[in-house]
Amino acid sequence: MRFIADFHIHSRYSRATSRDMELEALALWGKKKGITLLGTGDFTHPTYFAEMRSKLEPVNEGIYELKHGERETKFILTVEVSNIFSQGGKLRKVHTLIFAPNLSAVEGINDKLRSLGKLGSDGRPIFGFSAKELVKIVLDISSECLVVPAHVWTPWFSVFGANSGFDSLEECFEEEVKHIFAIETGLSSDPEMNWRLSMLDKITLISNSDAHSPNRLGREANVFECPLDYREIIGAIRDKDPRKFLFTIEFFPQEGKYHFDGHRNCGVVFSPLQTKANDYLCPVCKKRLTIGVMHRIDEMADRAEGFIPSKSIPSIHLIPLEEIIAESLGVGVGTKAVDGEYERLIRAGGSEFAVILDLPPEELKRFASPKVLEGIIRMRQGKIHIVPGHDGVYGKISILSPKDSGEGEVSREQMSLF
């Protein structure tokens, strides 16, 4: 079966996360979005894990659903872990995503990690040992677990981050690198940017929302064609199998909040070339700029932009439906007008991904307004305008601009959508 999966999310037990991020609401929003499989997130948190054990039941190997309530959305057991440690004479901060095959394995992981740090303070626990040690701990408990470095290019808290990361997976994980089969590209990079590094050719690139609120689910995701089974899914990722792992769904990376360099408080947004021309200093405050993902990839890349390696998993770039609606109405996301139109469109179209990804224009025309339809078509064609994100500020996207060219435009044909 073909299905969409978003593995990296957070529960209400993580900091700065909506109280609505609980299993029942996640299942309902998964159906709205058209996401068949959601990561649970935060399985190390004691209270949340107790909820999982009481509310979920297995339906396939390593796949769960609610005992009561919305059952179309399935769950796979996941957590993000933060490791802050010294290695190679530097302070390192690395976030990692863990997949577990069953609740018994999660219990074993939690028992071990509980002896090494606090699990109840945050749904994303923080530990003082290395990322390499985390791999050893997890795989000693279950060899069926999968460990994936998370949002690998963000300046802070990532394996390749400009401020506290490494220059290769081998440098970070040392002898345990043989167990690293995949990385998460993060919102501020996409597969095309990662293809510029030959050292990642054998690594599978996955994409997830890292959602902290229900409406953010699926802003990045993965599309599979395989049985809804833990071993099948993990096998497709490990093997980088294009017959089973069809493509990833991406944010336009310019919209990510660490894409370009800059200083948010000074209103400075620089490309890597502009940063170098200014000696890495902010022209306003004269302090060092926050170096973004594009700059870091430029530093590490050994290929030019546009290179496509063999056996790569393709990707498409989408914009959340609520953002398209908001621009068509000239109001903000989260307003009653946008929320009402969003609900109407997904009722008519079946789900958000059906509307923005699957349905052909002639079918959308039956229930979508002309402006929303134009926005969806322009998005599918890549004809949009973006002011790149920087220093923790999301980029600003414009779909319905009357301009067809100019600075900040992204214009490219994407793979066929229907």
What residue spans do the PLM features occupy?
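An N-terminally biased module of ancient metal coordination in phosphate/nucleic-acid-related enzymes
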Residues: 1-91, 384-385, 397, 417
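Extended substrate/RNA-proximal surfaces in nucleic-acid metabolism proteins
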Residues: 2, 50-181
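Conserved, mostly hydrophobic/aromatic
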Residues: 8, 42, 147, 183, ...
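Histidine-centered divalent metal-coordination motifs
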Residues: 8-12, 151, 212
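Histidine/acidic-residue-rich catalytic or RNA/ligand-binding cores of hydrolases
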Residues: 15-18, 49-53, 157-164, 195, ...
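Short acidic/histidine-rich active-site segments
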Residues: 202-218
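Cys/His-rich short segments
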Residues: 245-313
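Low-complexity, acidic/Ser/Thr- and charged residue-rich accessory regions of DNA metabolism proteins
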Residues: 325-418
